[in-house]
């Protein structure tokens, strides 16, 4: 049995979010939250929120035991970029891309995963 949670349009670069996500893939939920608590990264806060949501979905919707949950799948997809202009010298302008991410977390029982 598995449960899923998705956070969309998170204002953090997908590349930086993937670095955080790689730390907790395959770990137990409690262990993953402990790792994220001490990860000094903006993406860690967003990933923590999604992992907690997936665990709550598993507990509430599927009556699964929270201690046995494992992060079976976790991945980050690229969302739309916000394009901004940075004025430069001599009337020029540079484009700044504010990247967004979609974070997906799937938790399952230890028996299956």
UniProtKB/Swiss-Prot annotation:
Q: Which GO terms describe its biological process?
A: translation
Question: What top-level branch of life does the organism fall under?
Answer: Bacteria
The gene from which this protein is expressed is: rplV
Please tell me whether the keyword Ribosomal protein is annotated for this protein.
yes
* Protein name from the UniProt record: Large ribosomal subunit protein uL22
User: What family name appears in the similarity comment?
Assistant: Belongs to the universal ribosomal protein uL22 family.
What is the protein's quaternary organization?
Part of the 50S ribosomal subunit.
Fetch the PROSITE patterns from UniProt.
RIBOSOMAL_L22 (PS00464)
Q: Is Ribosomal protein one of the keywords?
A: yes
Keywords for this protein: Ribonucleoprotein, Ribosomal protein, RNA-binding, rRNA-binding
Species:
Desulforamulus reducens (strain ATCC BAA-1160 / DSM 100696 / MI-1) (Desulfotomaculum reducens)
Q: List the taxonomic lineage.
A: Bacteria, Bacillati, Bacillota, Clostridia, Eubacteriales
